[in-house]
């Protein structure tokens, strides 16, 4: 059996002994049939938990996986860290007792639980450290799952327990997906906590009762939408975004790009789907709006194109739920009858940024070989487009983060964490940032001055662009109005 090699940098630190941590480099050999624990045993003098709980390249790993599988996921360059550097006890082991002390006040408020139930929190506590959030007040995902467990055991205390995790600055509404930060991108934790958020936003607890009411009021349907089964058009561009995000810059550049690609676009009155929190607050309303939008495109014989990441991820989720639940389709189609629409499986949707990345048969007139871009996207894509236009856009883990949804529930935390991302990109030396999310674009552009003050850093004028704008500039387009650049807060001066 062949011997394979791996380069590993290991976090070394012992509390009460070391002032600063350090990373020690190892070149390890392994065989195809070996597991992570076999590898850790080669690290002489390094402390670790035999019930695997650590981070590889900032991704949490909780299983003794085969090394070959881990190499396929992480490549052959690893950085091993404890789940939390803040609570590092020795090397890869954290001080869980110190973490548990944070919940002493909570336990004083629930005197009815048993000693065994109190100790149950220990089984959840490691989950707190998957989430990369930097909000120091955040109570933690593991703690939220523990409270959910208690709610099932004490249904009469459900509302009181829910209220304890409802605070805007520290509570469960601050949760964002952790799937990208967990080995194998497991989304079970996401679904468990989304369910808890749904329970909270449908309760009578303030401010979430009003938050839900206000969001649901934004679902607006056209009572008599147009229907042209055989139109002289080929596609429709989804255009129903929250008004404060000012999507015109993105929509204008996306439309121009599609026209240059030979597409003919029909404008349709799509319905807002509630954005990030739509599917959490009311699954049925979210699915109805999504089905309406898909059925409207179908009724007009066109493909439905999404030029924005968050809306595209929403429609993917909606289609998956709808297409796997015929009874939900039947229920929603009853509602759609009033609009003379019918939802059916197989309606074509397209993500414009994937199109930009794959359809490259056009002449490059303005290469970007002198520029560096910092891209922020939750959807992994190849570098085909960047290679075509000769743009350097280095990968970094934080590029998968998006804290813009927090602006709706905890503005200060959302601003701080979005601004942290913005300056990570700027400090990499980026000439411009690339946002695939309208919410993140809004934070980077419109809120940058306010956010920089809170972040305690002088505001930087580095602009943020959308992918269609970059593609158009690479094709030679220089009209700032046509590109939608005139609506940006930070002016793009490189044309």
What are the residue ranges of the model-derived segments?
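Iron-sulfur cluster-binding electron-transfer modules in prokaryotic oxidoreductases
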Residues: 2-24, 36, 202-495
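Signature of N-terminal electron-transfer/Fe-S-associated modules in redox systems
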Residues: 2-216
